[in-house]
Amino acid sequence: MYGIEYTTILTFFVSFIILDYTIKTLTRAMDFIIYRFLLVVVILSPLLTAQNYGINLPITGSMDTAYANSTQEENFLVSTLCLYYPNEVVSELNDDSWKNTLSQLFLTKGWPTGSVYFNEYSDIASFSINPQLYCDYNIVVVKYSTELQLDISELANLILNEWLCNPMDITLYYYQQTDETNKWISTGTSCTVKVCPLNTQTLGIGCLTTDTETFEEVATLEKLVITDVVDGVNHKINLTTATCTIRNCKKLGPRENVAIIQVGRSSTIDITADPTTMPQTERMMRINWKKWWQVFYTIVDYVNQIIQVMSKRSRSLDAAEFYYRV
């Protein structure tokens, strides 16, 4: 009996020694593998690069104070700037290397060669309806035009903000605007818009719903119309549907990576004083018209101050994606 007990104890003791030895062996092997792996990582780390997915903090500021002509010390190595201008610029400058000249001048303000893009447009009205704004920062240069002098605030409103729009069936339905961010936007070759406000019994207020001649005319033969009526009141709408389309639009918010520079003479209507564009006045500037070279020199001088009141692109390469959605 004692022999069996001694044998059991001896077996247990030997098993314990073997288990302890096995664990220590595995521990030494794991330590060897881990330390070798860390050594390889340390050696290769300086040779590897990786993408840093950080958070883009918006650039904020105020342009209530006078602009200062400054040169940015650090380069905008990860930013792009698009400058949009009317196509008449090319013919007036008559210089095949004007873009290269401006690129070199932007370089003195901290914008590397290749980070500034020049894009021309033929018609500011068409451009504002479907703006293709591809850069981190976008500056739109708008020259004063007598044909569009009363539309410039509406154009600025379209460019500086993102809109969500849906088609309207004015032959079947009455429409009302819910708040100040709700507008009716009409576009086409010739838009004449008339409205008839309705009371709670759907009877015309100062007009007859059956006679469009009694409707109030809010726009005549225009290419772009942003109609703003009394909120919370149903309206019957009459429109030249053959040459114009109308959409019910909601302003989603500002395009904070877009700024407008208005170029004009002393008689130019100042859009920065318009109540429809007042919330964006810090992203609207005016340059008195002289020559296009003078305009561009001024833009180069003050580009960094303009950028400081803008926020870098954060949602889409194509701003039109947020414009007309059906």
Swiss-Prot record:
<feature type="binding site">
    <location>
        <position position="231"/>
    </location>
    <ligand>
        <name>Ca(2+) 2</name>
    </ligand>
</feature>
<comment type="function">
    <text>Calcium-binding protein that interacts with rotavirus cell receptors once the initial attachment by VP4 has been achieved. Rotavirus attachment and entry into the host cell probably involves multiple sequential contacts between the outer capsid proteins VP4 and VP7, and the cell receptors. Following entry into the host cell, low intracellular or intravesicular Ca(2+) concentration probably causes the calcium-stabilized VP7 trimers to dissociate from the virion. This step is probably necessary for the membrane-disrupting entry step and the release of VP4, which is locked onto the virion by VP7.</text>
</comment>
<keyword id="KW-1038">Host endoplasmic reticulum</keyword>
<dbReference type="InterPro" id="IPR042210">
    <property type="entry name" value="VP7_2"/>
</dbReference>
<feature type="disulfide bond">
    <location>
        <begin position="196"/>
        <end position="207"/>
    </location>
</feature>
<dbReference type="GO" id="GO:0039621">
    <property type="term" value="C:T=13 icosahedral viral capsid"/>
</dbReference>
<feature type="binding site">
    <location>
        <position position="229"/>
    </location>
    <ligand>
        <name>Ca(2+) 2</name>
    </ligand>
</feature>
<dbReference type="InterPro" id="IPR042207">
    <property type="entry name" value="VP7_1"/>
</dbReference>
<keyword id="KW-1146">T=13 icosahedral capsid protein</keyword>
<feature type="region of interest" description="CNP motif; interaction with ITGAV/ITGB3">
    <location>
        <begin position="165"/>
        <end position="167"/>
    </location>
</feature>
<keyword id="KW-1152">Outer capsid protein</keyword>
<keyword id="KW-0946">Virion</keyword>
<feature type="binding site">
    <location>
        <position position="95"/>
    </location>
    <ligand>
        <name>Ca(2+) 1</name>
    </ligand>
</feature>
<feature type="binding site">
    <location>
        <position position="214"/>
    </location>
    <ligand>
        <name>Ca(2+) 1</name>
    </ligand>
</feature>
<dbReference type="GO" id="GO:0044166">
    <property type="term" value="C:host cell endoplasmic reticulum lumen"/>
</dbReference>
<feature type="disulfide bond">
    <location>
        <begin position="82"/>
        <end position="135"/>
    </location>
</feature>
<feature type="binding site">
    <location>
        <position position="177"/>
    </location>
    <ligand>
        <name>Ca(2+) 2</name>
    </ligand>
</feature>
<keyword id="KW-0106">Calcium</keyword>
<feature type="signal peptide">
    <location>
        <begin position="1"/>
        <end position="50"/>
    </location>
</feature>
<feature type="binding site">
    <location>
        <position position="228"/>
    </location>
    <ligand>
        <name>Ca(2+) 2</name>
    </ligand>
</feature>
<feature type="binding site">
    <location>
        <position position="206"/>
    </location>
    <ligand>
        <name>Ca(2+) 1</name>
    </ligand>
</feature>
<feature type="region of interest" description="GPR motif; interaction with ITGAX/ITGB2">
    <location>
        <begin position="253"/>
        <end position="255"/>
    </location>
</feature>
<keyword id="KW-0325">Glycoprotein</keyword>
<keyword id="KW-0732">Signal</keyword>
<keyword id="KW-0479">Metal-binding</keyword>
<keyword id="KW-0945">Host-virus interaction</keyword>
<comment type="subunit">
    <text>Homotrimer; disulfide-linked. 2 Ca(2+) ions bound at each subunit interface in the trimer hold the trimer together. Interacts with the intermediate capsid protein VP6. Interacts with the outer capsid protein VP5*.</text>
</comment>
<feature type="disulfide bond">
    <location>
        <begin position="191"/>
        <end position="244"/>
    </location>
</feature>
<dbReference type="GO" id="GO:0046872">
    <property type="term" value="F:metal ion binding"/>
</dbReference>
<feature type="glycosylation site" description="N-linked (GlcNAc...) asparagine; by host">
    <location>
        <position position="69"/>
    </location>
</feature>
<feature type="binding site">
    <location>
        <position position="301"/>
    </location>
    <ligand>
        <name>Ca(2+) 2</name>
    </ligand>
</feature>
<feature type="glycosylation site" description="N-linked (GlcNAc...) asparagine; by host">
    <location>
        <position position="238"/>
    </location>
</feature>
<feature type="disulfide bond">
    <location>
        <begin position="165"/>
        <end position="249"/>
    </location>
</feature>
<dbReference type="InterPro" id="IPR001963">
    <property type="entry name" value="VP7"/>
</dbReference>
<dbReference type="GO" id="GO:0039624">
    <property type="term" value="C:viral outer capsid"/>
</dbReference>
<dbReference type="Pfam" id="PF00434">
    <property type="entry name" value="VP7"/>
</dbReference>
<keyword id="KW-1015">Disulfide bond</keyword>
<protein>
    <recommendedName>
        <fullName>Outer capsid glycoprotein VP7</fullName>
    </recommendedName>
</protein>
<keyword id="KW-0167">Capsid protein</keyword>
<feature type="binding site">
    <location>
        <position position="216"/>
    </location>
    <ligand>
        <name>Ca(2+) 1</name>
    </ligand>
</feature>
<comment type="similarity">
    <text>Belongs to the rotavirus VP7 family.</text>
</comment>
